[in-house]
Amino acid sequence: MLAASQITFLQVDLGRWDRSPGGDAIVVPLWTDVRPLRGAAGLLDWRLNGRLSQLLREGRLEGAAGEKLLFFTTRVPWRRVLTIGVGEISTFSEDAFRASMNTVLDSFHGLGIKSVGMALPGRDMERITPERALRVLLSVAEQQAEQNPGNALSELTVIDTPPAIKAMTETVRAIERSLGH
């Protein structure tokens, strides 16, 4: 499992992103039925001069569940961008969240991606609580690390709003206490 020292939090704010150490990849979720893009995806799109919106308009990207696109960038502190399609808002559930986390972590296999900034799917539209999202993510990451030890993340920066970050920080502390750390 990722230790508390390996998890940091970052607000959805370009100024804070620019001052962050960045890493190997930033992950943002895309919905099929939310336009314009919101949250971290919308902010990233703005920083990328509308590249995500253009891909959506051209039909090269839809936001369908399980869809993913990985590309390089120099416009944010992360070297790569991974978009993950999460489908329609109305069909999003904890199972969909879990599936999207598996898709994200599977995508890193063999690419040497160890340090990730991630806007958790469903958080931008309040479809999953911050606490539950973090717990499910950590569970999926632990399962993936057991299956592919060489592919485990070494650093995770969760990107969200200040209230969600506060809730997730408390969740990390509670997990650490329960593990006796």
Where are these regions (language model features)?
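Glycine-/small-residue-enriched capping loops at alpha/beta junctions
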Residues: 1-181
